[in-house]
């Protein structure tokens, strides 16, 4: 099946908004085995939008339009598509009720007549409810071509796609089953090299590597009759892949950490903390609370995390954590001594089972004769205090901090897995 994505909005063409929806939708279509052959952006103009829809209908089986579902006159996606299909616009009962509920809590004057446009769908279409907004989406097939209309804001589009569109398309079109393997501690180029014979000779299942910031994923996909057969085929391939070794001789399984498109090192670590009923704290310098805010973003985080420290300066490390100032000056803040001291003191002061610390040089300048991207990560438990040094070179400050937190979560995850192996 050939699909085409059409982003509607003059603000995309003028560069005011980045079209992140295209990447998200392309990934979702790939998961379903639907090939996206074309991506188009068009302004808020009926004539040009009609032209784009006409072209897409001549070369694609599935046309997905994003944006232009709002209440204003320049929001004309549904109106233009309805005109092209020679269909009327009708009101969706559920969407109308949502409008009623929304405006019932506001001043009567706030409900202007143009808001009703958001509850309209093309006659004969399947409505796609909007859980986070007011503009309803829709799906319709006419003359063998399927059309989807989605809201533009990613906060509305993503839930609608994940919860409404993907299940709908899965039932109608897809026989593709996928499994995503996640890796940390190996680059895409080395992973592809190690698995080159599998990738070059792939037929079914297929293997697709993707580089993320600080990590790599492999999507394994197969077309088969049912989930049970897919699980068997993908499981066999996974076992073969993970039996390989890195160029340094390390088992590939050692740098594999989990499954799923939406998974993360932080989530894996959080779930292990919950599983083993362990608490954690952190003392952060260069990351300025990123580790802690990431951990706290998971529902139920209070089960494992009660608080921590952000000690950006040397003086605050001494004041808040009780580390000897003269020793800090002697060893420097970018050191194993400081990382281990921060982790241990954070653990002792909060009574947590595990203490983590991050200290280093975010860049772009050197600090204490250490290059940008030098990070020390400490970890303290009741029985052991240790640290690792990582060098995250050629990255922005934000990337250095983000990747440093990945290393910290991975360090905690490995510690918890050792505990798992002892049980």
From Swiss-Prot:
UniProt similarity note: Belongs to the CinA family.
Annotated protein name in UniProt: Putative competence-damage inducible protein
Protein origin, superkingdom: Bacteria
InterPro entries referenced in this protein's UniProt entry, alphabetically: CinA, CinA-like_C, CinA_C, CinA_KH, Competence-induced_CinA, MoaB/Mog-like_dom_sf, MoaB/Mog_dom
Encoding gene, per UniProt annotation: cinA
CDD domains membership: cinA (cd00885)
Cystine connections: none
Pfam families: CinA, CinA_KH, MoCF_biosynth
């Amino acid at each position: 099946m050939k699909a085409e994505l059409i982003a509607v909005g003059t603000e995309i063409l003028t560069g005011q908004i980045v079209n992140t929806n295209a990447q998200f939708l392309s990934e979702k279509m790939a998961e379903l085995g639907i090939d996206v052959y074309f991506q188009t952006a068009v302004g808020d103009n009926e004539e040009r939008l009609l032209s784009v829809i006409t072209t897409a209908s001549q070369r694609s089986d599935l046309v997905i339009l994003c944006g232009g579902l709002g209440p204003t006159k320049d929001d004309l996606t549904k109106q233009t598509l309805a005109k092209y299909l020679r269909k009327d616009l009708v009101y969706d009962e559920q969407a109308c009720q949502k409008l009623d509920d929304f405006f019932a809590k506001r001043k009567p004057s706030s409900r202007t007549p143009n808001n009703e446009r958001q509850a309209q769908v093309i006659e004969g279409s399947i409505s796609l409810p909007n859980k986070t907004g007011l503009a309803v989406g829709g799906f319709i097939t006419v003359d063998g071509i399927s059309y989807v209309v989605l809201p533009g804001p990613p906060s509305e589009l993503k839930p609608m796609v994940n919860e409404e569109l993907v299940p709908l398309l899965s039932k109608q079109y897809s026989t593709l089953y996928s499994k995503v393997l996640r890796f940390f501690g190996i680059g895409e180029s080395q992973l592809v090299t190690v698995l080159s014979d599998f990738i070059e000779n792939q037929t079914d299942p297929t293997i697709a590597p993707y580089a993320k910031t600080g990590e790599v994923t492999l999507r394994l996909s197969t077309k088969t009759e049912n989930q049970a057969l897919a699980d068997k085929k993908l499981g066999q391939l996974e076992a073969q892949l993970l039996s390989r070794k890195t160029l340094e001789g390390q088992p590939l399984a050692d740098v594999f950490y989990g499954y799923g498109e939406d998974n993360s090192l932080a989530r894996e670590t959080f779930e292990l903390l919950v599983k083993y009923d362990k608490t954690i704290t952190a003392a952060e310098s260069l990351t300025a609370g990123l580790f802690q805010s990431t951990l706290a973003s998971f529902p139920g985080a209070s089960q494992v995390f009660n608080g921590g420290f952000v000690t950006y300066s040397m003086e605050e490390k001494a004041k808040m954590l009780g580390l000897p100032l003269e020793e800090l000056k002697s060893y420097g803040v970018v050191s194993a001594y400081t990382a281990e001291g921060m982790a241990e003191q954070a653990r002792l002061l909060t009574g947590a089972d595990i203490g983590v610390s991050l200290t280093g040089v975010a860049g772009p300048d050197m600090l204490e004769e250490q290059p940008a991207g030098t990070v020390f990560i400490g970890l303290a438990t009741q029985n052991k205090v240790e640290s690792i040094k990582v060098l995250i070179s050629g990255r922005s400050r934000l990337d250095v901090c983000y990747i440093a937190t990945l290393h910290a979560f991975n360090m905690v995850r490995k510690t918890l897995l050792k505990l798992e192996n002892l049980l």
